[in-house]
Amino acid sequence: MTEQQENKQRAIDLLESRYRGMENVCETIDMRLRMYFEDLLEHSSAREDDPNDWHGLYELLGGAKFLRCLDTYNFNTKKVQTVIRLREGEWRQDEGVWRHISGGLKCPGIAGGQVYRWAPFQVFALASIYGFYAWIDTQVPAGSKPQLLRTEREKDGTIWDYRRLCTDFTLTGSRKIDKTGFGGFIGMEFMLFEDYNMEGFCCANSEDRAKIIFRRIKYLLSGLDTENRFRLTESLAAWRDKYSEISTASIRPMTAGGKFKDGWFAQLCLKDEFGAAPYANGKSDMKMLVDVIESSMGPRREPLSVTMTSAGRITEGPFIQILDGLHGMLEREQSIAKGEVQPVLTDDRTMTLLLEPDAWQKEEQYLLTNKTVRHKVNPMLGVIVQHQFYDDQIAKAQRDGDTGEVIAKLFNVYSSGKVTKWITGDRIRPLQVAKRIEDCKYIDQGRERWKVFCGMDFSHGDDLYAHGYLAVDYLPSNTMRGRFFFDCDAWVLEKTMMESPNRPLYEEWVSQGWLKVCPGEVFDSI
């Protein structure tokens, strides 16, 4: 086995160890949740070209994280079951076939509006978002409020609030896994059952894309609006004024690059196809839009950001960086299991379902010829999309001489993901030493041995400001021996870190001493 395959085998072992004993707990929540975990274990392998290998490393680690959280935090089973039934209604199994009995909401289908039953992976996603609850330290001094909310209590000198744990969820996979239906349902649920004055936003790279999920939300709302309670236009879905005693919730589409204003008070941000947003001249219109929306969530008790995306035909983009951060967060599950690090609440507020090929499967030829990898990126294979669809699309792309779209959208692999890394972390880690740049001060016979080169990466305040140091130990010229030492320092504004989607990763770097936080609006690197 390669090191990558050994790492995946450890993930399989971790998932199995956490799942054993939790079978009945998962079944009590929903039988499909148990089915999901048992499918993960039954159809996962670390052996190359194993036809039984249907799940990738980061899906497995996401499942392992869910089980740890299930053993750590409170879980609102009734809430999850209510959310599940809201769209699918009641079903009964008849001679091995599930048949719709009553209730639920009709969704668009090839035969018109139909009520669909959630698939096991979708039940896992809904449980990840709606199930977990935790006491959150608001850091407001005890006794400072004349009256506590019914969800609040005073403890250890501050006020704690009982809240939904998940504030950020990422679903990434290929086309045709009903990402639109999933996001549209969440938007509708927030319109009905979340904050009285909920504000939601459907964010996308183009106007047409932004309106796809928005129109699905309107479709679902219109299906249950027998009393004309909602105002549904091309740019707004909202409760009508005469129902303001019930709710003033609203949701609207937003387009990257368009004109948008401050003053929003968002509780929900749906980010559709964020993975296709590129950087242009170091900036991303989509990221700027998302930053504006998410930065308005500060006062909300239970905000939620949901990313639904497949890969894009790009090599650099904001979501690629976010995805790298999510990978790192999930990889820490193995360190948590070993007791090397402790779980972090801010990390646990981010949940994922990452449907990706494994690292050794991202070469173009492998993707285009190996049918097993299709299961890893599309759990709806054989349900709403067929193998023949993949075969036809691959054949057409090869005839046209352009396989980029197929690789990105049907296999969820970025162009950057097909590039072999020159120097990997596995090669660097054994060379690390417990020294910093300040230690490079050796003087030999009155002559300084170390020479240091410094590169500076400046920031306008929306990213890190960093110094990279390369130190060279000059030995006498008649020898080929020498030493090189690399080190770095980085600074981030406190406001930037608090609002960044990479905040859990930044906080880990702060705790390890690699990142320094600067209050105010000025970087202090002295």
Per-segment meaning from a language model:
Residues A134-Q139, L464-Y465, N478:
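Short, solvent-exposed secondary-structure capping/transition elements
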Residues K218, A471-I526:
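Nucleic-acid-processing active sites and adjacent nucleic-acid-binding tracks
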Residues E448-Y474:
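Gly/Thr-rich phosphate-binding beta-strand-loop-beta motif of the actin/hexokinase/Hsp70
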Residues T2-M456:
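Phosphate/NTP-binding elements of NTP-utilizing enzymes
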Residues G263-W264, Y279-A280, Y465-A466, S477-T479:
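Extended hydrophobic-aromatic, low-complexity segments
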